[in-house]
Structures are given as C-alpha cells and as structure tokens.
C-alpha cells in the first residue's frame, strides 16, 4: 500500500463521520417540539392584593391624605384585580401537533403548585383560582362593589369636605379605631352595625380566643384586650395608618338609629336611663311623673328624636347615634374596605379572605344582646318613624344626610327631599 492511497482512505473515512454526525444533529433538532421553549401558564384569574408600603407587606396600603387616593389608572389602590396573562405562542409552534402540545400542557399543569395555596404571608400577591367556576364571578362582583363604594365616598368627600385633605390626623380622629397587629388590620367601630361581633373576630385574629362563640358581651365592650389606635404615639399612629388595612362597616342611618333606641331605652340600662333618659324626660315630656324623672325609664321614640335634633340638647351626643362621618372621619382617613350591615355575611367573609384569616374563621351570625327580640329591620324602622311628623322625619334625614350620601343609601321615605 502506497502512502498516497492510505491518505485518501483516511480522508474518506473522516468525511463519512462528519456527514453522519451532521445528519444525526438535523434529525434530533427536527424531533424537538418548539413549544417546550416557551413558558406555559395555568388558565384562571389572578387576584392581586398589593401593598403600597412597604413593598414586602401583603396587606392593602392606605393613605391618610385624600389627595393621594387616585392612581393614574383610576383604579383604587387597595384591592386590585388583574386579568390572567395570556401565554405567547412560539413563532414555530404553529406547525406542532396539537395532541402533543395538549399532552405536554397537562404534564406541566400537574407540576404546578395547587391553586389557592398561600406561599406565605410575606408574599405581595395571592393567586386564587376559585372552584367551582361560579366563584370567579362572585369574587369579581364583590371587588367591583368595593370599588363603587369607595368611589361614591370619595366624590362625597370631594364635594362637601374639600378642606379635609389639608387637615392633620389627630388622636381624636382615630379614637374609635381598633388595632389588630398580627394581620395588620384597623377597624373603625360603628355601633349598631355589627361592632360587637367584629371585635370578637379581631380577638380571634389576635390569638386572644379560639372561637368567637367563647367571647362574652362584657369582655368585648369592657375588656382591654383590643388596643385603640389613639393609645399609640404619633409615629405608631402614622405607621399603622400608612401600612395596615383599614376598614369600617356601616348601616342604613334610620335603621341604625331605631336599633340604638330599642337597645338603650326599651330595656333596663344602668347608664342610658339615668344619664340620657332623665334629661330627655325632664326637657321634652310635659308633666312627667316623679317616678319617670327619678329613673329615666320609659322614653318614647318621638321624645328621643326631639333630643337628637335639639341644637341645645340637655345631654351630649353618644356614639350609638352619632354620624359615621364623625366617628370614623372617612374624608380624612382613606379606608380600604367599606362593608355594609345589609350585606354583612358576604362582605365580612370576603374581607377575611382578603387578609388571609384562618380558613375556619367566619363572621358570627348570632345576636349579641336581647337575642329573643327580632332584629331591627326596614319594616320595624318604618313603624317607629310613623310616630313622627313629616317635618321631624325630614329633619332627621337632614341630620344624617352625609351618611346617606357618602354610603349611597336611598331615601327611606318618598316625601323626603
């Protein structure tokens, strides 16, 4: 064998190896599915509760200044609903077999974490894929209701309380706000709008009780387990107003007024009868008996309304019938969540879900006091207001006008203007 012939054979062998290698590489590439190169997402709705400050906080951000309420997009900064991101197909994926893509998508979904799993309270986003599908629309509806309530409240404040944004928050403005630090919640107490049961819920959230049913009325109202916001120094107040979720629950004003009257004056009461009852009977009942003046018992609803509307009333106001706009200062404090007594169960449990409360905690439905007595309803409210003249009804409506306006309640009587 000559050296020239050996060299030619080696060259041919090397060329054959390169040719087979290139052919194998092309075959391998042609068998790959380009869809594997593009990320897949599980279909569903992504609900995002984003903090405003600090970034790692999982709660809704609140501003104490009305001037900072509106974001450029026009959506509230508290609850934020986002549509799901649509997966982007790879440019070469159009020709891939449909069956192969579906099979690989199913395999990918199986590897995803379970929907609705909370990956920790420090996460700034909560991904919820409610089941069944009807829960999706329910969640969206409750979210939209919150947006509308806050919009109405902002507009009323802008129209009638234009100077509020320039006022500083003082301890007096936050004296009715209760603090729950574990879940970073601030709750403004509105008496006769479910406040007793809300305090029970806060005590369970704080780890002070295992069940709302175990907490007695006196513990709720006369104990010191829950802190008020005005007990903190200024730095503590400002910090919590800026970073905690602030919420309040309201009630139809006439209905709330009647509920307060029934509770405080139609049942024995060692405080309201001697303090308010005696003063009301002495001023507004002609020829009141000695017994009535001694005990303060037996105040009638028209007499109570006379006291309420009197600018020179003989005894001051009380939180049970004071305006919500005075109790909670909603034009000065930017509340993230506005619930209503009339839709308490839905609103309360929606709120508990938003703050990642324990799954077994729901809002209690029992009546706190006088459980044998019917709740104050619209029908009962009309019966009490039927005892008043049309002028008294109008003046009472005027008295609560800001509450009707801010919380979008309809006029309770057709002859009101």
From Swiss-Prot:
What are the entry keywords?
A: Carbohydrate metabolism, Glycoprotein, Golgi apparatus, Membrane, Signal-anchor, Transferase, Transmembrane, Transmembrane helix
Q: Which GO terms describe its molecular function?
A: dermatan 4-sulfotransferase activity
Kindly list the residue ranges recorded as spanning the membrane.
Answer: 11-31
Summed up, the tissue specificity of this protein is: Strongly expressed in brain. Weakly expressed in lung and kidney. Weakly expressed in pituitary.
What does the record say about its membrane topology? Answer: Single-pass type II membrane protein
Q: Which residues lie on this side of the membrane: Lumenal?
A: 32-417
InterPro entries to which the protein is assigned, alphabetical: Carb_sulfotrans_8-10, Sulfotransferase
Q: What class of enzyme is it?
A: transferase
Compartments where found: Golgi apparatus membrane
In this record, what's one Pfam family? Sulfotransfer_2
Q: Which residues bind 3'-phosphoadenylyl sulfate?
A: 191-197, 251-259
Report residues carrying sugar chains.
121-122, 287, 360, 408
Q: Identify the EC number(s).
A: 2.8.2.-
Q: What's the domain of life for this entry?
A: Eukaryota
Name a single GO cellular component: Golgi membrane
Instruction: Give the region (Disordered) as residue ranges.
Output: 47-101
Q: What is one process in the GO biological process aspect for this record?
A: proteoglycan biosynthetic process
Q: Which residues lie on this side of the membrane: Cytoplasmic?
A: 1-10
Q: What does this protein do?
A: Catalyzes the transfer of sulfate to position 4 of non-reducing N-acetylgalactosamine (GalNAc) residues in both N-glycans and O-glycans. Required for biosynthesis of glycoprotein hormones lutropin and thyrotropin, by mediating sulfation of their carbohydrate structures. Only active against terminal GalNAcbeta1,GalNAcbeta. Not active toward chondroitin.
Task: Give the record's family classification.
Answer: Belongs to the sulfotransferase 2 family.
Q: What is this protein called?
A: Carbohydrate sulfotransferase 8
What are the top taxonomic ranks of the organism?
Eukaryota, Metazoa, Chordata, Craniata, Vertebrata
């Amino acid at each position: 064998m000559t050296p020239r012939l050996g060299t030619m054979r080696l060259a041919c062998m090397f060329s054959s190896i390169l040719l087979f290698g290139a052919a194998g590489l092309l075959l391998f590439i042609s068998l790959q599915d380009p869809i594997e190169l593009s990320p897949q997402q599980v279909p569903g709705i992504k609900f995002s509760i984003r903090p405003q400050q600090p970034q790692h906080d999982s709660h809704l951000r609140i501003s104490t200044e009305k001037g900072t309420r509106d974001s450029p997009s026009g959506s509230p900064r508290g609850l934020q609903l986002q549509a799901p991101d649509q997966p982007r197909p790879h440019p070469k994926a159009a020709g891939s077999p449909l069956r192969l893509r579906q099979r690989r998508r199913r395999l990918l979904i199986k590897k995803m974490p379970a929907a609705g799993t909370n990956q920790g309270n420090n996460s700034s986003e909560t991904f919820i894929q409610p089941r069944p599908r009807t829960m999706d629309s329910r969640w969206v509806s409750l979210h939209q209701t919150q947006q509308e309530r806050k919009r109405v409240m902002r507009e009323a404040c802008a129209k009638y309380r234009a100077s509020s944004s320039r006022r500083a928050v003082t301890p007096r403005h936050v004296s009715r706000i209760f603090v729950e630090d574990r879940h970073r919640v601030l709750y403004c107490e509105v008496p006769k709008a479910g406040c007793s049961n809300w305090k029970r819920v806060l005590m369970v959230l704080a780890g002070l009780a295992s069940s709302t049913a175990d907490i007695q009325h006196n513990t709720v109202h006369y104990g010191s387990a829950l802190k008020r916001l005005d007990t903190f120094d200024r730095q503590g107040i400002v910090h919590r107003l800026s970073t905690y979720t602030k919420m309040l629950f309201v009630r139809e004003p006439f209905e709330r007024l009647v509920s307060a009257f029934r509770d405080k004056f139609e049942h024995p009461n060692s405080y309201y009868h001697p303090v308010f009852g005696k003063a009301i009977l002495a001023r507004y009942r002609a020829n009141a008996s000695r017994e009535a003046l001694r005990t303060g018992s037996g105040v009638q609803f028209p007499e109570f309304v006379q006291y309420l509307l009197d600018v020179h009333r003989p005894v001051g106001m009380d939180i049970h019938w004071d305006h919500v706009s005075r109790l909670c200062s909603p034009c000065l404090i930017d509340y993230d969540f506005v619930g209503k007594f009339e839709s308490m169960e839905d609103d309360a449990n929606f709120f508990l879900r938003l703050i990642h409360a324990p799954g077994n905690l729901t809002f209690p439905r029992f009546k706190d006091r006088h459980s044998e007595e019917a709740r104050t309803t619209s029908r009962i409210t009309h019966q009490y207001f039927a005892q008043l003249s049309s002028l008294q009804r109008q003046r009472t409506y005027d008295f609560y006008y800001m509450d009707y306006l801010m919380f979008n309640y309809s006029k309770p009587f057709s002859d009101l203007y």
